[in-house]
């Protein structure tokens, strides 16, 4: 007997097409079962099909979804989850048009958050991050990548990674930990970036032994780390058994996209300034292009990543919030979906695949997350919507009704959710 059977699902978005990264036409295709049903037993999906096919199945609990839509739990593959403080004091500078790198030089930006994170205890960081994770869950996210990078010293970086490990045990959302010690060059290492990177590399063996990080990342940008420094650093991390990511071409077209494809990074993230050659190389690689349009929006910039061109050229595109206190302080991945549709010229179908299938591959979770398939974890979202296009179309609010994590209800809007209204 099933534990739970969901029936009367108007649109069941299984996302279950070909295995592997989705590109071109596959990104614009959504496998949808009309009038669907999903069976759950011991936290695992055991039935996926139509309501007609589900007749005769027995379950301890039968949930009538009222003709609404069900999707897999969403995957946010790029966040800076664990940090201290906030940076609303920088809003005035941004409105005045002060460039981010100039704010950084003045001790703001990342360095401001570094100081606040250093001054926070691990428990304070955990409690703050739980608040943000709760919000992410309420937007339908069940798997999240979490970076360190607000320490720039060994003690604080360890503290962030240990906080992430504690959150993994205490919060229902699945976390994927990334070490981003190379997020900026500390003042005491100004002009000595190679020495700083070696210091970061010296931390990796113990980090690997304690399993505190799965990925290593670096901020490859003008005034931070060069392409050659980034490649050398990430290749050494790969030699130690880590998978790697790269903050690439966010501000200037340095060649970060090319570097990511060349070294076989799991993802290249941002890519606002990615060159035509970089896009071509990504298209011919298994590196996911994780685009972060919420950051471009919040920084009030005119030029967004060329998502349309990337998809047309064959790049596997994912979307993420880039949740962080400075350049994208939002947990709302649904808003990111809307911005991607409007500013990156992505179709609703492409947007959905970019926050499920491709985003799961960007963090090496393609075999466990992002799809509704028999044998996978029952990470599901019931939406207060009757079709998938409605979610990115009606922007700025959450359309989530209920979230199941491993077959258990982890979030419900409850009585606040409409039940009799029609769209």
From Swiss-Prot:
Recorded E.C. number(s)? 3.5.2.7
Q: Which residues of the sequence carry a binding annotation for 4-imidazolone-5-propanoate?
A: 87, 150, 183, 250, 327
**Any single GO CC term annotated in Swiss-Prot or TrEMBL for this entry:** cytoplasm
Listed pathway(s): Amino-acid degradation; L-histidine degradation into L-glutamate; N-formimidoyl-L-glutamate from L-histidine: step 3/3
In which compartments does the protein localize?
Answer: Cytoplasm
Binding residues for N-formimidoyl-L-glutamate, per the UniProt record? Answer: 150, 324, 326
Q: Which reaction does it catalyse?
A: 4-imidazolone-5-propanoate + H2O = N-formimidoyl-L-glutamate
PANTHER family this protein is in? IMIDAZOLONEPROPIONASE, IMIDAZOLONEPROPIONASE-RELATED
What's the name of the protein? Imidazolonepropionase
What lineage is on file? Bacteria, Bacillati, Bacillota, Bacilli, Bacillales
Q: Which gene name belongs to this protein?
A: hutI
């Amino acid at each position: 007997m099933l534990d739970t059977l969901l029936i009367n699902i108007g649109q069941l978005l299984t996302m279950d097409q070909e295995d592997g990264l989705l590109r071109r036409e596959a990104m614009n295709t959504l496998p949808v079962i009309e009038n669907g049903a999903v069976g759950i037993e011991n936290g695992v999906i055991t039935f996926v099909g139509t309501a007609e096919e589900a007749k005769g199945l027995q379950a301890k609990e039968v949930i009538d979804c009222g003709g609404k839509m069900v999707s897999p739990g969403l995957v946010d593959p790029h966040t800076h989850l664990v940090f201290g403080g906030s940076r609303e004091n920088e809003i005035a500078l941004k409105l005045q048009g002060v460039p981010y790198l100039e704010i950084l030089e003045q001790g703001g930006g990342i360095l401001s958050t570094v100081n606040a994170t250093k001054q926070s205890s691990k428990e304070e960081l955990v409690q703050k991050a739980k608040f943000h994770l709760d919000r992410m869950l309420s937007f339908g996210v069940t798997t999240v990548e979490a970076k360190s990078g607000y320490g720039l010293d060994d003690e604080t970086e360890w503290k962030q990674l240990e906080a992430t490990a504690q959150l993994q045990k205490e919060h229902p959302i699945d976390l994927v930990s990334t070490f981003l010690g190379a997020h900026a060059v500390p003042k005491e290492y100004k002009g000595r970036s190679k020495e700083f990177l070696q210091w970061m590399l010296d931390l990796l063996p113990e980090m690997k032994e304690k399993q505190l990080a799965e990925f290593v990342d670096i901020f490859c940008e003008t005034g931070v780390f060069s392409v050659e420094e980034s490649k050398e650093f990430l290749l050494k991390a790969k030699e130690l058994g880590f998978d790697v990511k790269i903050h690439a071409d966010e501000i200037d077209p340095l060649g970060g996209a090319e570097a990511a494809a060349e070294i076989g990074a799991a993802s290249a993230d941002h890519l606002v300034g990615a060159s035509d050659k970089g896009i071509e190389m990504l298209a011919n690689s298994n590196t996911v292009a994780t685009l972060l349009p919420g950051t471009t929006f919040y920084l009030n910039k005119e030029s967004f990543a060329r998502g349309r061109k990337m998809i047309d050229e064959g790049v596997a595109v994912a979307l993420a919030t880039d949740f962080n206190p400075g350049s994208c302080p939002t947990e709302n991945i649904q808003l990111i979906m809307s911005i991607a549709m409007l500013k990156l010229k992505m179709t609703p179908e492409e947007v959905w695949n970019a926050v499920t299938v491709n985003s799961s591959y960007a963090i090496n979770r393609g075999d466990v997350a992002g799809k509704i398939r028999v044998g996978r974890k029952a990470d599901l979202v019931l939406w207060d919507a009757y079709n998938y296009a409605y979610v990115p179309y009606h922007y700025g609010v959450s359309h989530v009704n209920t979230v199941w994590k491993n077959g258990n209800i982890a979030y419900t809007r409850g009585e606040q959710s409409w039940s009799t209204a029609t769209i």
